[in-house]
From Swiss-Prot:
Xref: PROSITE patterns: GLYCOSYL_HYDROL_F5
Organism: Halalkalibacter akibai (strain ATCC 43226 / DSM 21942 / CIP 109018 / JCM 9157 / 1139)
Family: Belongs to the glycosyl hydrolase 5 (cellulase A) family.
pH dependence: Optimum pH is 9.0.
Entry EC no(s): 3.2.1.4
The UniProt record lists the keyword GTP-binding: no
Protein's name according to its UniProt entry: Endoglucanase
Stored InterPro entries: CBM17/28 (IPR005086), Galactose-bd-like_sf (IPR008979), Glyco_hydro_5 (IPR001547), Glyco_hydro_5_CS (IPR018087), Glycoside_hydrolase_SF (IPR017853)
EC top class, as a word: hydrolase
Reactions performed catalytically: Endohydrolysis of (1->4)-beta-D-glucosidic linkages in cellulose, lichenin and cereal beta-D-glucans
Keyword line: Carbohydrate metabolism, Cellulose degradation, Glycosidase, Hydrolase, Polysaccharide degradation, Signal
UniProt miscellaneous comment: Alkalophilic Bacillus sp strain 1139 is not a true cellulolytic microorganism because the enzyme is unable to hydrolyze native cellulose.
Coiled-coil positions: none
Amino acid sequence: MMLRKKTKQLISSILILVLLLSLFPTALAAEGNTREDNFKHLLGNDNVKRPSEAGALQLQEVDGQMTLVDQHGEKIQLRGMSTHGLQWFPEILNDNAYKALANDWESNMIRLAMYVGENGYASNPELIKSRVIKGIDLAIENDMYVIVDWHVHAPGDPRDPVYAGAEDFFRDIAALYPNNPHIIYELANEPSSNNNGGAGIPNNEEGWNAVKEYADPIVEMLRDSGNADDNIIIVGSPNWSQRPDLAADNPIDDHHTMYTVHFYTGSHAASTESYPPETPNSERGNVMSNTRYALENGVAVFATEWGTSQANGDGGPYFDEADVWIEFLNENNISWANWSLTNKNEVSGAFTPFELGKSNATSLDPGPDQVWVPEELSLSGEYVRARIKGVNYEPIDRTKYTKVLWDFNDGTKQGFGVNGDSPVEDVVIENEAGALKLSGLDASNDVSEGNYWANARLSADGWGKSVDILGAEKLTMDVIVDEPTTVSIAAIPQGPSANWVNPNRAIKVEPTNFVPLEDKFKAELTITSADSPSLEAIAMHAENNNINNIILFVGTEGADVIYLDNIKVIGTEVEIPVVHDPKGEAVLPSVFEDGTRQGWDWAGESGVKTALTIEEANGSNALSWEFGYPEVKPSDNWATAPRLDFWKSDLVRGENDYVTFDFYLDPVRATEGAMNINLVFQPPTNGYWVQAPKTYTINFDELEEPNQVNGLYHYEVKINVRDITNIQDDTLLRNMMIIFADVESDFAGRVFVDNVRFEGAATTEPVEPEPVDPGEETPPVDEKEAKTEQKEAEKEEKEE
């Protein structure tokens, strides 16, 4: 009770602060300065030329530095975006998206990230290749260069058998597009020590020699084929393409080969200098310095992937650091592609992701207008768009929102009628052409500020809906008339927290406020919370912010008929703090009997971040949360998934074979689809990702009563970790994630997790039963009681 009271007080304080802040405009930067004023190369894009102008690309030495030039020998810089994995996000391959990137973003390049492992090309070569071909064709049609990226990622050795199809793939693409100047071939995205699914390579000259051993024959094949005589080829470098310096020490013998640098501004610091002569490669540790070294030693560099987050895709965004990096790239005419064109819930994604109760995922098809509006872009996407265009970064105010309450587009009155207490009764209300038509207003003609009581009243008693308007500051509506006139409206929004609060005044629109609208005239009428205290009472209430009705007092000056449309609220988003139970220390097995979460938290990419609390399930404490899968499904079913994360410094598999836990469901709705439970570890030695190959599936259309325990559906989840073959028993796993993915389901409700633990293989040796006195009745085993007793004993041991 005390926690709930404190939470209410905190929410009330936040609401008051929001109201106060809304009274003052956002302060402009001091003296009108912008962040770009401190740099020389962030603004402008004169060198960002299109294929129709620049033609075939080539490498030349300009001002003592190898760089990319156009067919005329003039500098050219490619700026654009990389797709995410085409096996996961193929929806970006559409003409509307490409036109948005080419025209609105002013990109002159796109990178097609064709993963080979991780269910990519090696698993389904024909399908994935067809997507690459579609992406190439769209780029050519939209006058953009296109990087065909053979996305070496997991495993990190490009010589691994999973990548055996590289030479054939590039031969086929070159044959389809012989000597096409639009196409750039990227042979190895990120060679690294990542041994997830195969071998990795070291971060030294031995690692570069491995990359070179792989790349040399492909470069030779492309040149000898007659289909890629002069196309630019890009080759990755060790340590996730952070070592172009190693390539500069021993470059590939080819006239048009460049080398990659990849960086993430939250992980890779800038540097103003290279290295002293004769610095051993083992002492070259800064990514920007490695790039400077490569340029100084005669090779050309291309930043084919960079992000505004940390290297794992989360944290940030780090825009100040990004400005320093982009300044460096632009100053040195280094082309760049940002990661990535995805609505995945990661900071580096360009589009708004799905987050439960907060946002829906932006469609990767922007629609026929071929523009993603700023609200559809993530913070990173909005920033990168400005940097591609070379314009000032002016972020929108993302705290403002608009919610349409009544739009009348369905052809109905949406619950509106003449209010029972209206002093003017002969008003006819109907839907005409998608607006609410009010007729018979001749007798409702007081347009003064305070005498609205004499006017006609209408209300939405039959609406039957409820909308949360937390933080609302204004109520607006379109007033449509045959001829400009004066219309006066007062409003009483209603909801559980405010049934009736008299308006302070009526608000009017006058003839000069109207503008032509086809054969009529339209004005927008705005009622503030100061005009309608009821609006403020609902919007700023600490517990209930729902509106479920509205009473409007309508007066006109000589107009018998008016129309109302698009009744909506405008306000400021209020971030209500999520109150979790204490995190506690990371403990495995996790039994939660100490009242803490024992180290469990939401992963950064989790699509659900509701309150994690300790609740009772089957007689003992369990980690619990509420959520629901959305009706409109994103393309990535992990985007909406709750992702539990558990970090422990000494976390290893040991001799265990399974991760097991008790999982309980208390559904409000669960009639179709399934929940797919995945297990992931993030060991640094394996590229921060290993995934159990098998999952645990709960089919919601097969929920059975026998699975119920004390009103909850109970599942003993067991996921095999012995099948993860590329880790050892003593591999430091760092952290464990449990991911509850949506499979076309309608689940909504509360879930519980308990007794999370490693477990060995089940013992199969028979156990001899003890003899039982025939005169005694053997009591049945109460599993619930036994489990509770076990936990109490464990708790007592800890206390001792």
